[in-house]
């Protein structure tokens, strides 16, 4: 995939922490342009998320996962912010203004499938785990994550 996508990967609403994920060719560049500390592969780095004027929006943890060793098989950046819905919207808008586009539902998993990181059963299992409403549904869905069926 040539474009870079961004979306919150935690449930919407107020929480202690929210995570925003970027994936694609420019994920590292876009995230680094708005983060005060230097990103390092597979290292959680503490720094500031900066707005367009360089003002601090939040103090955050940021992790870079260089492709192909990431969930999607592409460069991925995950930013752990305080869980304010406004802050999450601002972070996503900031990354979109710098060249990312808003990811569609399931698009990170779709990319993982297309890049050979998940087989079809595992990709469907991710969505089933997310949508599970009962313990039995959750157990059945979790069994698909490894790509096996019963």
For each of these PLM feature ranges, what is it?
Residues 1-139, 143-147:
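A glycine-rich (often HGG/GG-containing) alpha/beta subdomain
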